[in-house]
């Protein structure tokens, strides 16, 4: 891992490069093709989008990583609505993965979110990676994932308090922001703006 990287806020001039980066990173990972590049494209105009936490990572003048945050809520069992953040997509360029850049970008992003006074981040991820940055299973905070049947595996659903004790005494249901839900036809139309890539059905895909 080289140390001459920079992390800064995304600018409009970065949009296409970021979308290309995300497309390459997620292509055929969770589904044949991917939708994450279109998700980012639409999230930028969403009211829940946090512009102060929309980051790119550069190395040698090239954008090699990105991360973003959205505002959402926990619908608490006692009737309260608890403001929280969700995160992602987050990615690093394929040729630079597993070299430490992802954790650096993640930790920087979380520090900036905490500095804004925000209380907690909840999202879907792998505990083996995100646990190294302080995430735990959301079930440990008594927070449930929306629409997940009781007793179903929720090990993908993670949480990190940015303010210690922010979720003390709270139980409830996390809501994914609507901006993450996109129509497949819209994804297909948007994807035609990019170089053609082969969609493959591969083992381990979840969609």
Segments from the language model and where they lie:
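Acidic/histidine-enriched, glycine/proline-rich intrinsically disordered or flexible terminal extensions
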Residues: 164-207
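Conserved acetyl-CoA-binding loop-helix of GNAT-fold acetyltransferases
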Residues: 87, 92, 98-111, 123
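A conserved beta-turn-beta hairpin within the catalytic core of GNAT-like acetyltransferases
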Residues: 73-86, 97
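Conserved glycine-rich acetyl-CoA-binding loop
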Residues: 62, 80, 93-104, 116, ...
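Active-site rim helix/loop that mediates acceptor-substrate recognition in acyltransferases
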Residues: 19-22, 26-68, 73
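Internal, conserved structured core segments that host functional sites
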Residues: 52-53, 57, 88-91, 118, ...
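A short beta-loop-alpha structural element at the N-terminal edge
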Residues: 6-18
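Conserved active-site alpha-helix within GNAT-family acetyltransferase domains
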Residues: 115-118, 125-152
């Amino acid at each position: 891992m080289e140390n001459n990287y920079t992390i800064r806020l995304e600018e409009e001039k970065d949009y296409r490069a970021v979308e290309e980066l995300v497309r390459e990173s997620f292509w055929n990972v969770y589904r044949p093709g991917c939708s994450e590049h279109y998700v980012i494209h639409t999230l930028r105009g969403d009211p829940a989008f946090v512009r102060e936490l929309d980051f790119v990572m550069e190395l040698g003048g090239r954008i090699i990583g990105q991360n973003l945050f959205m505002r959402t809520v926990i619908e608490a069992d006692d009737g309260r609505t608890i403001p929280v953040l969700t995160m992602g997509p987050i990615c690093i360029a394929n040729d630079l993965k597993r070299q430490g850049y992802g954790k650096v970008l993640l930790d920087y992003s979380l520090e900036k979110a905490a500095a804004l006074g925000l209380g907690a981040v909840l999202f879907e991820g792998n505990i083996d990676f995100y646990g190294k940055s302080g995430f735990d299973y959301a079930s440990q905070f008594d927070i449930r994932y929306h629409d997940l049947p009781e007793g179903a595996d929720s090990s993908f659903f993670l949480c990190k308090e940015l303010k210690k004790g922010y979720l003390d005494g709270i139980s409830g249901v996390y809501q994914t922001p609507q901006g993450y839900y996109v129509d497949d036809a819209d994804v297909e139309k948007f994807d035609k703006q990019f170089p053609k890539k082969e969609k493959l059905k591969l083992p381990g895909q979840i969609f």
